[in-house]
Amino acid sequence: MFERFTEKAIKVIMLAQEEARRLGHNFVGTEQILLGLVGEGTGIAAQVLKSMNVNLKDARVEVEKIIGRGSGFVAVEIPFTPRAKRVLELSLEEARQLGHNYIGTEHLLMGLVREGEGVAARVLENLAVDVSSIRAEVIQMLGENAEANVSGSNATQARSKTPTLEEFGSNLTQMAIEGGLDPVVGRQKEIERVIQILGRRTKNNPVLIGEPGVGKTAIAEGLAQRIANRDVPSILEDKLVITLDVGLLVAGTKYRGEFEERLKRIMDEIKSADNVILVIDEVHTLIGAGAAEGAIDAANLLKPALARGELQCIGATTLEEYRKHIEKDPALERRFHPVVVGEPSVEETIEILFGLRDRYEKHHQLTMSDGALAAAAKYANQYISDRFLPDKAIDLIDEAGSRVRLLNSQLPPAARELDKELRAVLKTKDEAIRAQKYETAEQYRAREMEIKAQIAAIAQSKKNEPDLNLEDPVVTEDDIAEIVAAWTGIPVTKLTKSESEKLMQMEETLHGRIIGQDEAVIAVSRAIRRARVGLKNPNRPIASFIFSGPTGVGKTELTKALASYFFGSEASMIRLDMSEYMERHTVSKLIGSPPGYVGYSEGGYLTEAVRKKPYTVILFDEIEKAHPDIFNLLLQILEDGRLTDAKGRTIDFKNTLLIMTSNIGSKVIEKGGGSLGFELSEDQTESQYTRVRSLVNEELKQYFRPEFLNRLDEIIVFRQLTKDEVREIAELMLNEVFARIKQQDIQLNVTERFKERLVEEGYNPSYGARPLRRAVMRLLEDSLAEEVLSGKIKAGDSPVVDVTNEGEVKVLLGEKLELLT
């Protein structure tokens, strides 16, 4: 209770305890509270008593006459008498009746008068005070204070009829009159439907149902604005739209029945005022609110009033919460009438952004271009898939405004350096003053003034620049694109010259790591260029390929190279080894376990990875090893760029590049379509590749369903590696070994003879480049490891690896290099 006491009321209680000590009493009674009220001197109670000729001296005399003096021994903690406790309870009740959420001296005085049987009442009678007129005097004085502090508008007078509601809610109508609400654009149909339901005789309670961020609360604000503008039917004129904070209503209810008491008071106030429309955002929070230890929850307390039409309530909640909480309670559900609030279209969102533009321009102190607003709606719809319009578009313009303002408010680099120097000079000057080195301090003072003058000059020159500060900074389409790119990782910004050159030279860049396989490199490069320029189909993935061919020719390596050069790093690639998905039940690993199974809350590996990183390469390695049911899952990804996970969320694959590798047809490729064992001319090689490709396609058709193959953009058959290509790959592998051993400060070289030996042992058309890797490990890495461990090669050496005439690999140092013959 005491937390609601004003400072003056607390002072009265302290003075009452002092009076008890003065008279030697071990209790605080009504008479001590009266003496405290008189002694406080500045509160409303003291002023009222003073106007009735009550002073502290006379009051003390009367109290002493009635109760006398005590024993003299007084405890540290002085308890209240039962009558004094009753006075405190009555003062709380008086405060509530007057609609005050505090207890002041005036309430304590009215509590004393209302109690009427204590020593205080007898003291007042003895002092010839008209006790019956005290309450009227207090209320009159309270009224004068209120008139001095509050303007007497109709809205304020009406609001004072509902003090409890005012404490636990916000008056949207008043905020609309004062211009404190954002303008509501569109939504006329939904607002009309809400007005229609509010006009009913009974069960006049609409509930706004929609996804998060579509503008449910805005509809309630739109209704408040229409009432403020008197643009409503006569049945709703002069109504007050008040939003109730359920959390605040529950907060601080320590004792049983306190929550119910608050809610009943609110309902009584609404019933007596007869002009309140209650708005409860997140209306599902009513269910269970305040229901502790068998108490009745808020929803059950409100049910009778909602059904009889005594309470007009607008609820707002999401589809999921409505289904989970309100539909489970048919008795509550029948009292509400759903108004479905759909997500606005991109065009409607642009109109909403134009309506809100002034508010955001004023807040950020800049200008927002028409193109920026249109881009915000378009990009939000296209690239941010897990949220809803117009909320995500509004967030884009808000953050873009913040970014542009911050960029324009920063000092130039030269001024920032000077500012840093100024702080150092001030610190040194203060140290010199503390050390009483006043001459040194004077020198630093001169430097301080010099730096301040330089900073002022730079700021002035920036202000005088013609194109920068004559007008407010402008938020452009590029700024919106920067924010989208920062949120999602998808490059939406316009192409820079360096990036354009990088994309044009993409094949050359990939060929630095991938030897041969021109068809695959060209197909992947074209897909990336198409997506980056914005010419790809916005409703499909960037591209989808099957890389088919023999083992070890660079199918997975090409995907790694692509992820490394154009998506940040190899780690940014989402890699799924399909040999892990050979059983039917492993489908759940991709999209998440169904409800009731272990791991439901964790989500699927594929869907969660794409939600976190929507712009990436997805590699389905060894696709033919997967269970056939996996391919059914891929159909909607390949066609529509979307997949629904176990929780019902739609995951967007429209900015992913899908690559599947397969060894299907490797037997056909190994046979090479005939002419095996003979050196082929270029024309023969090309015709052989064409024949092999058609045979591989036939094999794929036998293994995969037509609807799966038909959704792929391209099936690329990798060629077998030629001896020259294996030689180039050998150079790459040797360079990797050189780089690794250079970290130990050893400069390694190999002879041409060793390279030829490496190619001879590592070349196998059927197995690609993997035998070469084994040859490097056996011939080079093993020999080097033995020499390093034996101590023959140490840091700083420059060994050379060669092959003797007998075919033995030798690691030679400086003095033995003459053996190289």
UniProtKB/Swiss-Prot annotation:
Q: Which domain of life is it from?
A: Eukaryota
Q: Where is this region: Repeat 1?
A: 5-70
Q: Where is this protein found?
A: Plastid, Chloroplast
| A molecular function (GO) term | ATP hydrolysis activity
Single GO cellular component annotation? chloroplast
Coiled-coil boundaries = none
Q: Name one Pfam family in it.
A: AAA_2
Signal peptide interval: none
Which protein are we looking at? Answer: ATP-dependent Clp protease ATP-binding subunit ClpA homolog
